[in-house]
From Swiss-Prot:
Keyword ATP-binding on entry: yes
InterPro entries cross-referenced by the UniProt entry: AAA+_ATPase (IPR003593), ABC_transporter-like_ATP-bd (IPR003439), ABC_transporter-like_CS (IPR017871), ACT-like_dom_sf (IPR045865), MetN_ABC (IPR041701), MetN_ABC_transporter-like (IPR050086), NIL_domain (IPR018449), P-loop_NTPase (IPR027417)
Family under the similarity heading: Belongs to the ABC transporter superfamily. Methionine importer (TC 3.A.1.24) family.
Catalytic reaction list: L-methionine(out) + ATP + H2O = L-methionine(in) + ADP + phosphate + H(+); D-methionine(out) + ATP + H2O = D-methionine(in) + ADP + phosphate + H(+)
Membrane topology: Peripheral membrane protein
Localization of this protein: Cell membrane
Cellular component, GO annotation: plasma membrane
Gene: metN2
EC numbers, comma separated: 7.4.2.11
Binding site for ATP: G38, Y39, S40, G41, A42, G43, K44, S45
Keywords for the protein's UniProt record, in alphabetical order: Amino-acid transport, ATP-binding, Cell membrane, Membrane, Nucleotide-binding, Translocase, Transport
Residue intervals of the ABC transporter domain: 2-241
Full protein name: Methionine import ATP-binding protein MetN 2
């Protein structure tokens, strides 16, 4: 659906060259929700603007639905953009227009007239849950309602791709979740490919199938969301994952557990989706005659499944403890004995 090959974006300012996007390669499948996460200055917003030709690459190619966006110009590019909707952090609504008129705007530009345009506007208002707000102005809407207008407007011409540039960054947590649920629903109903740019790992965890982590213009990590959460490789990825896992990996927690539970062994357990909700702990304790004392843990849900992390104290004979760890591994639970 979307292919980026060796994409580079370089800016020149006062004889200084800034490499905003540094040789990025990506393949995004039709119908998936793909996340790009990074801190400010990582290059993620520059990257997404090349998907619809708002920015042109200095080198490399950007292909969307078999069309080389990086090489077309003029009317061909304008027509291609009708198939690539976009929503923004600050909504970018026309304040002198009502909700219905804002949604109708791209239809007007596309030459859709009369009853056909009114029908499409009403259809979109129902899709995003704004019934009764048709004649309201942006100043009368909440932040979440404004973003719903932005989403409806972006979908007006039945695009195949929806770009979301920090679309929830200006919203409170509850409204953020409501907008994310709406995007999930739209993805499932319309089989729409959605690209999400964000600095919030909660957004990635909640709706994305795959994620690319950017730092200094490069994609430093790429994979299924569940795999990235389980085994983050890069330091920047580990920092992002800790946003939504309560800092499980902090040295402070590990030292606290080792200092306060001197008997037996302290073991970190990592459960995957197939066993994250099963009574594995009680089964292993019973069959190996050990006591398993749960000290700390959490369960994280992603679009690819759930995974859980537990820190447990294992009490029993040396042979029984080793047998229990062996059985846990056989049950596809990853184990790590913490060293004192």
């Amino acid at each position: 659906m979307i292919t980026l090959q060796n994409v580079v974006k370089e800016y020149t300012s006062r004889n200084n060259k800034v490499l905003a996007v540094d040789h990025v390669d990506l393949e995004i499948e039709q119908g998936e929700i793909f996340g790009v996460v990074g801190y400010s200055g990582a290059g993620k917003s520059t990257l997404i603007r090349m998907f619809n030709g708002l920015e042109l690459p200095s080198a490399g190619t950007v292909e969307v639905d078999n069309l080389l966006i990086s090489q077309i110009r003029g009317s061909k590019l304008r027509k291609a953009r009708q198939q690539i909707g976009m929503i923004f952090q600050h909504f970018n609504l026309l304040w002198s227009r009502t909700v219905a008129e804002n949604i109708a705007f791209p239809l007007e530009i596309a030459g859709v007239r009369g009853e056909k345009r009114r029908f499409r506007v009403n259809e979109l208002i129902r899709l995003v849950g704004l019934e009764g707000k048709e004649n309201a102005y942006p100043s009368e809407l909440s932040g979440g309602q404004k973003q719903r207008v932005g989403i409806a407007r972006a979908l007006a011409n039945n695009p195949k791709v929806l770009l979301c540039d920090e679309a929830t960054s200006a919203l409170d947590p509850q409204t953020t979740d409501e907008v994310l649920e709406l995007l999930l629903d739209i993805n499932k109903r319309l089989h729409l490919t959605i690209i999400v740019i964000t600095h919030e790992m909660h957004v990635i965890r909640k709706i994305c199938n795959r994620v690319a982590v950017m730092e200094n213009g490069k994609v430093v990590e790429l994979g299924d969301v569940l795999d990235v959460f389980r085994h983050p490789q890069e330091k920047v990825t580990q920092r992002f994952v800790r946003q939504v896992t309560d800092s499980d990996e902090t040295e402070e927690l590990i030292h606290l557990l080792l200092d306060n539970y001197a008997e037996g062994k302290i073991v970190k357990l990592l459960f995957m989706s197939e066993n994250a909700t099963q009574p594995v702990i009680s089964q292993v304790a019973k069959e190996n005659d050990v006591m398993l004392n749960v000290l700390h843990g959490n369960l994280t849900q992603t679009q690819n499944g759930a995974y859980g992390t537990l820190y447990v104290q294992v009490l029993g004979t040396e042979d029984a403890i080793n047998a229990s760890l062996t059985q846990l591994r056989q049950l596809k639970v990853e184990t790590e004995v913490l060293e004192r």
